Amino acid sequence: MVFSSIQAYLDSSNWQQAPPSNYNHDGTGASANGGHVLRPQLQPQQQPQQQPHPNGSGGGGGGGGGSIRAGSMVDRARQANVALPEAALKCPRCESTNTKFCYFNNYSLTQPRHFCKTCRRYWTRGGALRNVPVGGGCRRNRRTKSNSNNNNNSTATSNNTSFSSGNASTISTILSSHYGGNQESILSQILSPARLMNPTYNHLGDLTSNTKTDNNMSLLNYGGLSQDLRSIHMGASGGSLMSCVDEWRSASYHQQSSMGGGNLEDSSNPNPSANGFYSFESPRITSASISSALASQFSSVKVEDNPYKWVNVNGNCSSWNDLSAFGSSR
């Protein structure tokens, strides 16, 4: 004896579909009537699942109806008998069918939003100026642009570094070609202004606190005067000019000592010091008066015309005979 109704009763998919009151129809129970009672009740419930879908997509059994979430926009569109957007809609920008439906824009069933996987653009049908996708919306392109900007900045930095190194190499090449490339040889061709000064005004060396002496060569920081002194280029005749200056200094010293001017120089110390500086102990002439006299003398002379005219030294290395230019101001 085969009980055909037991399999239908034990099937878990039929438990919720069949109401409990149907199993005791006419008080006889399920075992008495068997499948004659259950089969007419199960068939009407399976028929709506086999009917075609209202939106025209076709019924796929119970699985198709269970994938739609209740209360979603798709469910609302089905209830309003609105056809769902096409799955393979052509992109209005690249004419590709590799597109997908995303969602309804602004919760409106008349503005479905799609995405093209080929050109990676979004577009919305029914919206204002949104039918054709125009630019933007692609994160990959923005990353590429940021990388290109970083590459441009690194290139500009490398160009500046190479330009500065090229300038340094050019300057070093010029110095080596003109001065021999040695620091001592460069300093040896620069004439110290203290060697050209009259021994009477040698106390001006005390006015320059920032004086660097190297092998009896010094650059006095007189402000604008120091730039003019640094621009003097002796060339190959530096040694002969130094000998002329030494000769001029000794002649000027003997001339002043023969004049007997005790107010200008102390005659008790005839020997100069080894470094080219002389003692000055006159109480009548102050450093301020000497500075003003030198400033007035230098302002009226152009260094470009004759670089040695500011110390009254001619090209033939003659001695300084005129002392009237530097008179004492009392």
UniProtKB/Swiss-Prot annotation:
Compositionally biased region (Gly residues): 56-68
Tissue localization of expression is: Specific to the vascular tissues. The PEAR proteins (e.g. DOF2.4, DOF5.1, DOF3.2, DOF1.1, DOF5.6 and DOF5.3) form a short-range concentration gradient that peaks at protophloem sieve elements (PSE).
Could you tell me what induces this protein? By cytokinin in procambium. Antagonized by the HD-ZIP III proteins and by mobile miR165 and miR166 microRNAs.
The compartments listed are:
Nucleus; Symplast
Q: Which GO terms describe its molecular function?
A: DNA-binding transcription factor activity; transcription cis-regulatory region binding; zinc ion binding
Which GO terms are recorded in the biological process aspect for this UniProt protein? plasmodesmata-mediated intercellular transport; regulation of DNA-templated transcription; root radial pattern formation
Query: What is the recorded name of this protein?
Result: Dof zinc finger protein DOF2.4
Organism, scientific name: Arabidopsis thaliana (Mouse-ear cress)
Originating gene? DOF2.4
